[in-house]
Swiss-Prot record:
Its EC number is 3.5.1.18. It holds the Pfam family Peptidase_M20. GO terms for biological process: diaminopimelate biosynthetic process; L-arginine biosynthetic process; lysine biosynthetic process via diaminopimelate. Zn(2+) 2 binds at D102, E136, H353. Binds 2 Zn(2+) or Co(2+) ions per subunit. GO terms for molecular function: acetylornithine deacetylase activity; cobalt ion binding; succinyl-diaminopimelate desuccinylase activity; zinc ion binding. It catalyses: N-succinyl-(2S,6S)-2,6-diaminopimelate + H2O = (2S,6S)-2,6-diaminopimelate + succinate. Catalyzes the hydrolysis of N-succinyl-L,L-diaminopimelic acid (SDAP), forming succinate and LL-2,6-diaminopimelate (DAP), an intermediate involved in the bacterial biosynthesis of lysine and meso-diaminopimelic acid, an essential component of bacterial cell walls. This is Succinyl-diaminopimelate desuccinylase. PANTHER family: ACETYLORNITHINE DEACETYLASE (PTHR43808), N-ACETYL-L-CITRULLINE DEACETYLASE (PTHR43808:SF31). Its cofactor is Zn(2+); Co(2+). Belongs to the peptidase M20A family. DapE subfamily. Homodimer.
Length: 380
């Protein structure tokens, strides 16, 4: 009997799986997949829940993979929600709740498609699902743990589809063939405290750091590349912790976040930031220290067989040819890309992480149909 992806989405939304809690979501998926003949393994690391499921022979020449997550961000002020954030309520043509868009509907649609596919037309190959409970958190023990376990166990995917919401306005208009890299730079400026009436007796870390931030934010990192928009740098914090208006503080901190294309690497940008900080430090006499956190490098799955497979299926079901894009934030595709070619396609993501997150019910069944067509065409 075919699985209803709308009902499954609602059931998953009712699982309060705020990172790092599993909330019953992976248990539910495991029961469904096990009942359909998938070999399921829980790959939990450091208390983080993950699920690996495979239908078909281990080591098959053609193995289609799916990656997704069931963890969700916190609801915030629950009183601000129109409906219960974990109610999975369907009203006015929408399915409401935390994770409805990001990305329990995508997971439900692929689970439903995969079960229908292997039961109706068993493929000559394997279908693998890697579902994590650590995408919205630190992402260190989720998809990374699954891929580590797969490598150790001799499990593999030939290609992978990530079911993140990718469409800005209409189902079918966009897929992701890559992502920008992301890094955060933490600056600490240390000067000499003093009276604001005698600035010559102090070394002002606020002025020095402001100069550095101005240099960074006014610099064009690049003007875009063939498949990527221009890299961006955003100032996200600037703090002194100084309540006194007549005191030049001894310490000032600032943070910038850079989303970068394939013209750069995390290492090359770190070197640039260090050089800029050293210039300002030399000019002002203020010590400026940098600590950089690189969340992921940019990557691209060049347009080809996988992206064309996805595009054809999307166009057949929606009438829209999806634009291949690298825009937006990071996703777990940044980890999968080292394992196999990866493309992302999912629903419209306008309300993800918002109060009253919801997904249009009319999109969920077509998404299942797209995923089912992708599977059929891949193994044809």
């Amino acid at each position: 009997m075919p699985i209803d992806p709308v009902a499954l989405t609602a059931d998953l939304v009712r699982c309060p799986s705020v990172t790092p809690e599993e909330g019953g979501a992976l248990d539910l998926i495991e029961r469904i997949l096990s009942g359909a003949g998938f070999d399921c393994t829980r790959v939990d690391r450091n208390g983080v829940p993950n699920l690996f499921a495979r239908w078909g022979r281990k080591g098959a020449n053609r193995t289609f993979g799916f990656n997704g997550h069931t963890d969700v961000v916190p609801v915030g002020d629950a009183a601000a929600w129109t409906r219960d954030p974990f109610g999975g309520e369907i009203a006015d043509g929408w399915l409401w709740g935390r994770g409805a868009t990001d990305m329990k509907s995508g997971v439900a649609a692929f689970v439903a498609a995969a079960v229908d596919f292997v039961q109706e037309t068993p493929p000559d190959g394997a279908v693998v699902l890697t579902i994590t409970g650590d995408e919205e958190g630190d992402s260190t023990d989720g998809t990374v743990a699954l891929l580590d376990w797969m490598a150790a166990e001799g499990e593999a995917m030939s290609v992978c589809l990530v079911g993140e919401p990718t469409c800005p306005e209409r189902l079918g208009e966009m897929m992701k063939i890559g992502r920008r890299g992301s890094m955060t730079a933490f600056f600490t400026a240390r000067g000499v405290q003093g009276h604001s009436a005698y600035p010559h007796r102090a070394k002002n870390p606020v002025a020095a750091l402001a100069r550095l931030i101005d240099r960074l934010s006014s610099h064009d990192l690049d003007y875009g590349t063939e498949h990527f928009d221009a890299s961006t740098l955003a100032v996200t914090t600037f703090d002194t912790g100084n309540p006194a208006t007549n005191v030049i503080p001894a310490l000032c901190r600032a943070t910038v976040n850079i989303r970068f294309n394939d013209a750069h690497s995390g290492a090359s940008l770190t070197r640039w930031l260090e050089e800029e900080a050293a210039r300002v430090a030399a000019d002002t006499g203020v010590e400026i220290a940098l600590s950089a956190k690189i969340s992921g490098e940019s990557f691209l799955t060049p347009p080809g067989e996988l992206s064309e497979l996805v595009a054809r299926a999307v166009e057949a079901e929606t009438g829209l040819r999806p634009e291949p894009s690298t825009s937006g934030g990071t996703s777990d595709a940044r980890f999968v890309r080292a394992h196999c070619p990866v493309v992302e396609f999912g629903l419209v993501g306008k309300t993800m992480h918002q109060v009253d997150e919801r997904v249009e019910v009319a999109q969920i069944e077509p998404l299942k149909a797209i995923y089912l067509r992708i599977l059929k065409d891949y193994f044809a």
